[in-house]
Regions:
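Basic amphipathic alpha-helical segments that dock to polyanions
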Residues: 95-102
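Short helix-capping/hinge SLiMs at alpha-helix to coil transitions
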Residues: 53, 68-72, 86
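DNA-recognition alpha helix
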Residues: 75-88
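Non-DNA-binding regulatory cores of transcription-related proteins
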Residues: 105-174
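Short amphipathic alpha-helical elements of helix-turn-helix/winged-helix folds
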Residues: 47, 64-69, 82
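Short alpha-helical segments that sit at the start of domains
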Residues: 31-61
Length: 174
């Protein structure tokens, strides 16, 4: 188990006791990923708690990658590869669950690009997207650059919650 592995590393002197008590420390298999600074960890813990999420190791590891202020678009698969490339093991299901929890909490925005393929956007401000179908890549479009000429009447008993524009693009061919 993780506790036994951590305690074994403590005895072997591979990690110091102070960092072992930091609950952000990600210990998966035999790999130890260094945590962010105490201030960064405290900020991530506060952000998660502010939206009603507990600060588990997995959530903190993903929050450190996603909530660092950079605007990015990630899929569960690409994020899992990024985590594994850093030497940390995390199940794809855990990544999916955490992305969905972050989305439900308003920390991320889901963009469904086609039937069963969603991309998660760290920019939660209102904006739209170009989707490059050849590169499987999203590009942000500022909301003010999209003008809607007319919106049909909403069925009785309903309100418009949001309008999200996704424009599919491909490379120009001569």
């Amino acid at each position: 188990t993780h506790k036994k592995a951590r305690n074994g590393r403590l005895r072997q002197g591979l990690i110091d006791k102070k960092s072992a008590t930091n609950h952000f420390l990600v210990v998966m298999s035999d790999v130890v990923v260094s945590p962010p600074s105490k201030d960064q960890t405290a900020d991530l813990v506060a952000r998660l708690h502010a939206v009603g999420l507990r600060s588990t190791r997995q959530r903190l590891a993903l929050a450190a990658l996603l909530l660092d202020g950079r605007h990015r678009h990630v899929s569960a698969d690409s994020l899992t590869r990024e985590i594994q490339d850093s030497g940390t093991q995390m199940a794809l299901g855990t990544v999916y669950n955490t992305l969905n929890q972050f989305t439900d909490a308003g920390l991320l925005r889901r963009v469904t690009v086609h039937n069963e393929h969603s991309v998660f956007d760290t920019n939660t401000d209102h904006h739209h997207h170009f989707y490059d179908i050849e590169q499987d890549r999203l590009y942000d479009i500022p909301a003010e650059q999209v003008q809607l000429a007319a919106i049909p009447d909403v069925p009785d008993g309903h309100n418009i919650e949001a309008v999200n524009v996704l424009i599919h693009i491909s490379s120009q061919r001569d």
